[in-house]
């Protein structure tokens, strides 16, 4: 169902109201940089599959992409080795556990289950093409820039803040490596993964990146193909299964769209063939998802009738 400009503008107002009225949560405090971001920031954006952009609030304030980056590194690797190889090497199942848990690794002989949790994302980073760590990182950055339709940059402040506190991810990488499921030097994989989480984006960027998936892999602003049409569906499936971690059930009920969150406060949701919704607000719930952003995206999706599990209109009996 295609949404008119007026409908999207009205939905944004409803989303803004829902986001601003949502309370609770706190900034991620285990990464020093994230703890220092003003908690009252809130932005919301929609970009359609034909390139129309709508936004409100702090939609052009930059923040750390964090785990939302996993989607785009997955796209890069899927283009390189194909979805079947990704499933074999990284996995394609929900864990039902926190995003940084090692329990799933122990239960599955050191193999990750999903490219959208930390273990699988580190394994995915180890599969990025390139002869050196810098070459692999540059490939990731160029991929992110292509999805956003503009030049993005690494925040040295975010990267340093994370590199000095990522001991848990280093342990995960060594567990993967010991099981033969980290496909490069494990510390190089963690370094690349940490860098990919440290680029700066806006809610408008995230909506554009999501709209690229909604448009079958072609950026609707630049016209550049970023991922083959056949690889879009597997990416959206991964987002559906693991994009919001242990809050996935609530998300499926209230939003009903493929989505991905990050502890920087961003959330991106994709309506295949139509548009993408993105929101940003730093305070997080216990699962690591932005309280205000979740409420805002849910309100926009509901207003536009874009919950994929809801039947609209008359149904024949």
From Swiss-Prot:
Q: Which UniProt keywords apply?
A: Hydrolase
Give the disulfide map. Answer: none
Q: What reaction does this enzyme carry out catalytically? A: L-glutamine + H2O = L-glutamate + NH4(+)
InterPro entries from the UniProt entry: Beta-lactam/transpept-like, Glutaminase
The EC number(s) attached to this protein equal 3.5.1.2
Q: Specify which residues bind substrate according to the UniProt entry for this protein.
A: 67, 118, 162, 169, 193, 245, 263
Q: Name one Pfam family in it.
A: Glutaminase
One BP annotation, GO: glutamate biosynthetic process
Entry GO MF terms: glutaminase activity
The similarity comment for this entry is: Belongs to the glutaminase family.
Question: By its UniProt entry, which NCBIfam families does this protein fall under?
Answer: Gln_ase, PRK12356.1
Quaternary organization: Homotetramer.
The protein's name in its UniProt record: Glutaminase
């Amino acid at each position: 169902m295609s949404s008119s400009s007026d409908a999207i503008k009205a939905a944004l107002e409803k989303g803004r109201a829902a986001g601003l009225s949502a309370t609770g949560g706190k900034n991620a405090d285990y990464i020093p940089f994230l703890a220092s971001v003003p908690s009252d920031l809130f932005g919301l954006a929609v970009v359609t599959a034909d390139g129309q952009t709508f936004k409100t609030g702090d939609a052009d304030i930059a923040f750390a992409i964090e785990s939302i980056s996993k989607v785009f590194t997955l796209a890069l690797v899927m283009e390189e080795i194909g979805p079947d190889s990704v499933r074999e090497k990284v996995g394609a199942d929900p864990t039902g556990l926190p995003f940084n848990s090692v329990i799933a690794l122990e239960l599955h002989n050191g193999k990750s289950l999903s490219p959208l949790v930390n273990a699988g994302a580190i394994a995915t980073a180890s599969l990025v093409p390139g002869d050196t760590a810098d070459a692999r990182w540059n490939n990731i950055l160029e991929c992110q820039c292509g999805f956003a339709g503009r030049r993005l940059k690494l925040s040295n402040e975010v990267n340093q803040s994370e590199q000095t506190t990522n001991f848990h991810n280093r342990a995960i990488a060594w567990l993967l490596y010991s099981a033969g499921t980290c496909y490069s030097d494990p510390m190089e994989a963690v370094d690349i993964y940490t860098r990919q989480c440290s680029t700066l984006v806006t809610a408008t960027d995230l909506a554009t990146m999501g709209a690229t998936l909604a448009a079958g892999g072609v950026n609707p602003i630049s016209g550049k193909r970023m991922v083959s049409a056949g690889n879009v569906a597997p990416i959206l499936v991964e987002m559906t299964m693991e994009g919001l971690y242990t809050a996935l059930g609530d998300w499926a009920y209230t939003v009903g769209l493929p989505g991905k969150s990050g502890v920087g406060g961003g959330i991106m949701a994709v309506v295949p063939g139509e548009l993408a919704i993105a929101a940003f607000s730093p305070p997080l719930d216990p699962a690591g998802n932005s309280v205000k952003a979740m409420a805002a995206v849910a309100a926009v999706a509901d207003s536009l009738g874009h919950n994929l599990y809801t039947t609209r209109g008359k149904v024949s009996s």
